[in-house]
Design a protein with these regions (language model features):
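Non-catalytic interaction-recognition regions
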Residues: 2-196
Length: 196
């Protein structure tokens, strides 16, 4: 990564750094337009700056920061786009109305239970982060939730293969989790990325 020392003149302006990260993203992802690359660059920088304890040095390693997997803002945005896409697919299958649906345990896998439990921890993570003045607690929470959600996404049957009640249950869980996920993105001031 790049070492920055103000005594040696190695300081970047934030906008220049975002542009450099955005250029790396555009080079890495063929379908990335400039606006999307800028949003991903901001996300990459936010996560890179907040994933570790603030008392430690921050390493600016652009190739690592822009990876599609791992502890990166790009990975988190990829997860958010996947969740919204799955939500849209489930809605297209005719399960958009779940106002009278209650969560049924027979449709919950152990991984889904773990995800729901993790999602329920957001208020505690915020409280702890504020009390200790450690923003990395929230970032690590979001990275962990992203990993669990991607595992769930990869292991889940396709929406078209689900029975109606199973689809409704998945939509209800997904809707709840997406609310938590997007609130956490906003908490970290990450811009919304619509497609990847």
């Amino acid at each position: 990564g790049k070492k920055m020392s103000s005594r040696k003149g190695g300081v970047f302006r934030t906008i220049e750094l975002i542009d450099e990260i955005a250029n790396a993203i555009e080079a890495q992802f063929e379908n990335s337009d400039h606006e999307q690359a800028q949003k991903l660059a901001i996300s990459a920088l936010i996560i890179n700056d907040t994933k570790g304890d603030i008392s430690k040095d921050v390493n600016l390693d652009i190739p690592t920061m822009t990876k599609m997997n791992g502890d990166t803002g790009v990975y988190i945005q990829y997860t958010a786009v996947r969740l919204r896409s799955l939500m849209q697919k489930l809605n297209e299958e005719g399960t958009s109305n779940f106002s009278n649906t209650t969560l049924q345990t027979q449709f919950i896998s152990p991984l889904q239970k773990k995800i729901l439990f993790e999602a329920s921890l957001l208020p505690l993570k915020i409280k702890t982060s504020l009390e200790l003045l450690k923003p990395h607690i929230i970032t690590q929470y979001l990275l962990n939730l992203s990993g669990l959600l991607n595992r769930w996404y990869n292991d889940s049957p396709k929406a078209v293969d689900m029975k109606d009640e199973e689809r409704k249950q998945n939509l209800l869980r997904l809707h709840s989790i997406l609310i938590v996920f997007e609130k956490t993105l906003k908490l970290l001031h990450m811009p919304r990325v619509e497609k990847m």
